Curated annotation (Swiss-Prot):
Stated family: Belongs to the TAFA family.
Pfam families: TAFA (PF12020)
Protein's name according to its UniProt entry: Chemokine-like protein TAFA-2
Entry GO CC: cytoplasm; extracellular space; nucleus
C-alpha cells in the first residue's frame, strides 16, 4: 500500500474516533445534567404523562410528578395541577381541602377515601391516590 493511502485511512479512523468520543461526552453530560436537575423548593413539575382507554372507553390518565416541598408539605393537587400541600390534608385524607378541582367544579371525597371526584354538570373526573 502506498503511504498516502495509509495516511488518509488513519486520518479517517481518527475523525471517526473523535466523533464517537464527542458524541459519548455529550450523552454523558446530558445524563448528568438530567440527574442534577432540581425543582425549585415549593414547586412541582410533571416529568411523565400516561394516557389510555379501558374496556369501557373511559379515558384514564396518570402522571409522574417531581416536587420539592417545604417542611410540613407533601405532593398534592391544587386546581387540577400538581402542587405542594399541607401534609395533614394527605395524612387525614381530607382531599377536598387542597382544592384539587378547577373553579366551578364540585369536589367530593370518594366513599373509600382513596381519592376524590370533581364534577361539573354531567362530567365527572375521578382521581385515585396511589403511592
Amino acid at each position: 500500500m502506498n503511504k498516502r493511502y495509509l495516511q488518509k485511512a488513519t486520518k479517517g479512523k481518527l475523525l471517526i474516533i473523535i466523533f464517537i468520543v464527542t458524541l459519548w461526552g455529550k450523552v454523558v453530560s446530558s445524563a448528568n445534567h438530567h440527574k442534577a436537575h432540581h425543582v425549585k423548593t415549593g414547586t412541582c413539575e410533571v416529568v411523565a404523562l400516561h394516557r389510555c382507554c379501558n374496556k369501557n372507553k373511559i379515558e384514564e390518565r396518570s402522571q409522574t410528578v417531581k416536587c420539592s416541598c417545604f417542611p410540613g408539605q407533601v405532593t398534592g393537587t391544587t386546581r387540577a395541577a400538581p402542587s405542594c400541600v399541607d401534609a395533614s390534608i394527605v395524612e387525614q385524607k381530607w382531599w377536598c381541602h387542597m382544592q384539587p378541582c378547577l373553579e366551578g367544579e364540585e369536589c367530593k371525597v370518594l366513599p373509600d377515601r382513596k381519592g376524590w371526584s370533581c364534577s361539573s354538570g354531567n362530567k365527572v373526573k375521578t382521581t385515585r391516590v396511589t403511592h
